[in-house]
Amino acid sequence: MHIKATVERLPGGMMLVPLLLGAVCHTLWPQAGSTLGSFSNGLISGTVPILAVWFFCMGATIQLRASGRVLRRSGSLVLTKIAMAWLVAVLCAPLLPIGGVPSGPLAGLSVLALVAAMDMTNGGLYAALMQQYGSSEDAGAVVLMSLESGPLISMLILGASGLASFDPLLFVGAVLPLLLGFALGNLDAQLRQFFAQATTTLVPFFGFALGNTLDLSTIAHTGASGVLLGVAVIVITGLPLLLADRWIGGGNGTAGVAASSTAGAAVATPALIAGMAPQFAPAAPAATALVASAVIVTSLLVPLLTALYARRGVARSG
């Protein structure tokens, strides 16, 4: 049986299929974790410890050695993505209930969902697109994109926009596993290679644990708004990223288009934020479902838009 190959045909499948399976389990048997206990409960409810290990391993993949040009390219994209997420948070905070829109075509939409979907780029998708349509320097920009992994950037955006106040120690706790992994990965290349293997292995596990916080009715309730959110991520972040790549990064804009996606890891952000800022707890389940939809939508549309833009540039230069 070719289960892995089949799952990977769906964009973000290694995250989203286990997430859906977890949601099915939670819908049919909400008390499964507490009833089974022990290791089964850890697998069902262990989102935070599983993600802690994943953040550590992600940190180990970030290499300190990078040319100034690569840092300029990646820095311009990362800072632009974060700036747009912050701007959206500031503009939408007075318009959206903190617990999310209760019904209608925007059902479940909240500032938490917007920030989580917009502040983290799908680094794997970006690197793959740049290997095909960009240069080695473009692909190398994924170096700084790894820093977006985890809830830290979302915490900073929500704090800077006045929507939340976090204890400084929570910021330290959020970034410490990433920094420890970063330190070890740069001290020993063999350790970097060793830990890097786990970054993909752990994805279905935290996807399943996250799914066990969702109900299928929540996913169905937010279906249309999830598609709209995915399109909004591309529209709102895509043009600024394109311009930043051209004007600041020194590229032709292709890298900017390729960076206008939502990372699979962003699906975990709402639950993690809600655990640190309880006022977001009512919005977290719907936000998780919305971000999962945005991952699928952007994973489908961004490669098409990147290819169209790159070919248009080739046609013009020719």
UniProtKB/Swiss-Prot annotation:
<keyword id="KW-1133">Transmembrane helix</keyword>
<keyword id="KW-1003">Cell membrane</keyword>
<dbReference type="GO" id="GO:0005886">
    <property type="term" value="C:plasma membrane"/>
</dbReference>
<dbReference type="InterPro" id="IPR004684">
    <property type="entry name" value="2keto-3dGluconate_permease"/>
</dbReference>
<feature type="transmembrane region" description="Helical">
    <location>
        <begin position="257"/>
        <end position="277"/>
    </location>
</feature>
<dbReference type="GO" id="GO:0015649">
    <property type="term" value="F:2-keto-3-deoxygluconate:proton symporter activity"/>
</dbReference>
<feature type="transmembrane region" description="Helical">
    <location>
        <begin position="289"/>
        <end position="309"/>
    </location>
</feature>
<protein>
    <recommendedName>
        <fullName>2-keto-3-deoxygluconate permease</fullName>
    </recommendedName>
</protein>
<keyword id="KW-0472">Membrane</keyword>
<keyword id="KW-0762">Sugar transport</keyword>
<feature type="transmembrane region" description="Helical">
    <location>
        <begin position="163"/>
        <end position="183"/>
    </location>
</feature>
<feature type="transmembrane region" description="Helical">
    <location>
        <begin position="82"/>
        <end position="102"/>
    </location>
</feature>
<keyword id="KW-0812">Transmembrane</keyword>
<dbReference type="InterPro" id="IPR018395">
    <property type="entry name" value="2keto-3dGluconate_permease_sub"/>
</dbReference>
<keyword id="KW-0997">Cell inner membrane</keyword>
<dbReference type="Pfam" id="PF03812">
    <property type="entry name" value="KdgT"/>
</dbReference>
<feature type="transmembrane region" description="Helical">
    <location>
        <begin position="42"/>
        <end position="62"/>
    </location>
</feature>
<keyword id="KW-0769">Symport</keyword>
<keyword id="KW-0813">Transport</keyword>
<feature type="transmembrane region" description="Helical">
    <location>
        <begin position="224"/>
        <end position="244"/>
    </location>
</feature>
<comment type="similarity">
    <text>Belongs to the KdgT transporter family.</text>
</comment>
<comment type="function">
    <text>Catalyzes the proton-dependent uptake of 2-keto-3-deoxygluconate (KDG) into the cell.</text>
</comment>
<feature type="transmembrane region" description="Helical">
    <location>
        <begin position="139"/>
        <end position="159"/>
    </location>
</feature>
<feature type="transmembrane region" description="Helical">
    <location>
        <begin position="109"/>
        <end position="129"/>
    </location>
</feature>
<feature type="transmembrane region" description="Helical">
    <location>
        <begin position="10"/>
        <end position="30"/>
    </location>
</feature>
<feature type="transmembrane region" description="Helical">
    <location>
        <begin position="194"/>
        <end position="214"/>
    </location>
</feature>
